[in-house]
Amino acid sequence: MSEELKYELPGLERKAHECESTRPEGPGDATKPDELATTASVYGKLMASAAKLKATFAAGDREGKRIAAAIRAAAGAYQKIEEQKAAELNRQMNGSDAPPPAAEAVVPDMSGIPGPLTIPSMEYPSAAAAADEMDWEAAARIIHSGDTQALSMKYFRDQWRDYQSTLEGHGRHFANPAEGWSGAAAETCAEAQRRLSTWWADMGAECGRLAQEATTFVDAHDKLVANHPTMDDVKAFEEAEWESEWDRQYAWAIKQEKSEDALEAYANGSQIQEIRPGKPPSIGGLPAVNDGDVQATPTSTTGGPGGPGSGSGGGSGGGASGGSGGGTPEMPELPSTDPSMSPMSTNSAGEEQSSGSPSSGGSSSGGSPSGGSPSGGGAPSSGGMPEGGLPTDMPGGPDIPGLDDPSLKPASAGGGGGGGVGGGGGGGMPAAPLGPAVGADSVSPSPSSTRGGGVGVPTGTGGGAGGMMGGGMGGMGAGHGQGQGKEKKRDPKLAPDEDLYTEDRAHSEGVIGHRPRREKDSGKQQ
């Protein structure tokens, strides 16, 4: 049974209710401060921009309702998937052996969702304002008989300025997607919410622009009122007693020039720009909801200690790959060898050997025969056969060449167990050249075969041990290589014993050419 879809019906309903929340009411209209032609033109442009914004906001409100309906439609589809899964669970609980039917994808029902709202086209007054050409007395009466402080337009400006933050706050209702659900339908709704939230923030900026255009208008009007002749000027002119008609005409011309300058400055200073808001983003259809839209989180990992893939392999027996572990142990890689070198000579030529090389037989109790001398003359003082027998849990080498490989050398090549002295196996010479082939005359004891007070006399069991354990590796006299160089002493605490090579192939006798031993009654060998 597939994993459960992640959704919470109450959480989705809360988000849907939030998306269809009512937007705070926007600013209302304003009245013209006077009846000048310039004023009427600018006022008409401001009202056209405000009406365009309001119609666009209504389209945004529709999109919020459409997103809310889409969330509810997706929740219904998710619920149908859950019903399918519940029916499947009941079928399994009743013991049915029939194969479970595949869960059908459910397409959210968007049929009841209204379409996007079309924003009506509105004509923006683009013609230039007619020039206010009139007597200064008539202009003064028009200007000063109206709203000289332009209080209505200033209130209009302040409302739109404050509405910017209101719209930004309204857009935050859509910023965060619904919690507790996921899947393709959830991502579609969440993306629609984010786009609409950004759009509302942009509409807030458009409100700020409209407020700035209104500020341009009221500032120009304030200058007009301040610079234009007033009604007191008209009264004073009419009540004045002029000495001559020339004086009267001269005074009138001065007032007319002042009026015209003020009106021209007003017309030039009240030029505003049209506000052109973009239409809101529209959510389309929702993708089908499938069982398994939510990716399952892995609850367990393959393998474990001693299990498949764990890389651990237990067991005993030197060189054996088997054991009591749960899986096949990984074999360590052997160092790459030159075809002209035997496996053992590769090791001795490349690095120092920390201890005697274990035999491939994996003897668990054998050791150096008591009284015998250690094999592999010239080996470090800490080398040789461990006292407790050969070490166990030594992995075998998987890449050993075959017997017919031309790279193999005779069994006598390389430092192995002492042919004439049958102690231990595989204690080769570190960093020493290859020894000559062993003949029948080269395996007899020599005066130099003793080391450290030991007697280099072959024993009855030593030869057999040398043949069994050092097969293919021995072939050098017990004293061969004595004194060829000083070995660095190894600290077993810092450099523990490490299996560098394990012999795992058919081998030849390591004591070729031995003559039958004769024992006397005294127990001495001859």
Swiss-Prot record:
Disordered: annotated segments: 1-35, 91-110, 271-526
Keywords annotated in UniProt: Secreted
Biased composition (Basic and acidic residues): 1-23, 485-508
Gene: espB
Cellular compartment(s): Secreted
UniProt function note: Involved in DNA conjugation, at least in the recipient strain.
Biased composition (Low complexity): 335-362, 393-405, 430-440
One Pfam family named in its UniProt record: EspB_PPE
Disruption phenotype: Loss of DNA conjugation when disrupted in recipient strain; strain still secretes EsxB.
Name of this protein: ESX-1 secretion-associated protein EspB
Coiled-coil residue windows: none
Entry keyword Secreted: yes
Further remark: DNA conjugation in M.smegmatis is unidirectional with distinct donor and recipient strains; mc(2)155 is a donor strain while MKD8 is a recipient strain. Mutations in a donor strain that alter DNA transfer do not always alter DNA transfer in a recipient strain.
The UniProt record lists the keyword Secreted: yes
Record family assignment: Belongs to the EspB family.
A GO CC term attached to the entry: extracellular region
Composition bias, Gly residues: 303-328, 363-387, 413-429, 451-484
